[in-house]
Amino acid sequence: MPFDSTRVVHPDWAGHHAPVSEGAMNATVTVRTGGSPGGWDPVTGPTPGTPAMVTFTGRARITYEVLRGYGDRDAAGQAVTVRVVTLALPRAAPEQPAGARITVDAVDQNGPVELVARVLTVDSTGWSSHGIEQILTCRDDQSNQPQGGP
């Protein structure tokens, strides 16, 4: 039994162990929020959108969920496939909101190479149990990608 003046867990336990998590990160990503796609004016034609703001660029850990989380869906009479991707950002990264868009810029030999250049949408956010990293649950809508489907 420790003395009353001692702590079993260091007060900055997460800060001490965060480098281990960051060392296991297998991708480089860019996170954007806001922006609009533009629109259409019946008189003048296309209207410009507004660019999204980059809120984070750096290392992340990406894992594809084993099963199709969202599965196949129907959108306007077309079958679309949506997969769940879990993404972890470093402890020091700014907190990201649901709805943010993440572009996978690169992966290392331990990352899912099929996600390079894909755009993921953040569905939910949270922190690991000890605050070591920010956990984002993302949607990989395989039918609506800038470069087309898979």
Annotated model-derived regions:
Residues 29-31:
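Hydrophobic, regular-secondary-structure patches
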Residues 1-26:
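N-terminal leader/capping segments at the start of a protein or of a new domain
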Residues 1-9, 33-150:
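Short, conserved turn/kink motifs that form compact alpha/beta structural patches or helix kinks used as
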